[in-house]
Amino acid sequence: MSDWNKNLAREIAKGIIATGIEGGYDSVAKSTAYNYPSIGVSQWEGNRADELLRAIPGGEEFIGRTYIDIKASGELPMLKELLRSDAGKQAALEQLSRDCLQYVEVLQQVPTLDDTRCIIYAGMWCPTSTWVVKRFLANRYMHVDLRSLEALYKLFKDYYWIAADVGELYRAGYANRARTTYEYVAGIDLTTPYGVPAYGEAGNGR
């Protein structure tokens, strides 16, 4: 894996965290599918939640416990405090960056999606479904300029809710996510601290 990919992955992770589009550091909710908690900036569940907790001092206390048990015991505030501690924040960034590396590798298979900001933008949608995002873009690259952040924003705002098959109920929420993500990505400084070329300065648009 290249340093370029690692840097892109970290930028995507930082964006997901900064915007809170998947949740805050101390997000804790009852999983929709199980009785166990869904935690952190990417709503990790099961083994992924356990992985995060193991990386935080004191986190093992909560491994394998149901959401109801943690709440009934009055320990929910303690779990939240643990997740938003400095160690918790660092562990979340590292774990999310590893997840985002997979997003980058999948997105690089989409023709013409090679602009830095556009990869970051698309990557910030991948927690919804990496494969849906990939298919959504791969099916449209002939008709939409995937090297244009503005074009990508409009594409996701208007059509991604249909591709994701989430129903009309989520249409407004996805439009808000598209705007929030666009505003974040348009404003980030890509010249530091990793030396990633600024938007449009590299020969391939990166």
Task: Name each model-derived stretch.
Residues 1-112, 116-119, 123-206:
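Cell-wall polysaccharide-cleaving catalytic domain and substrate-binding groove, primarily
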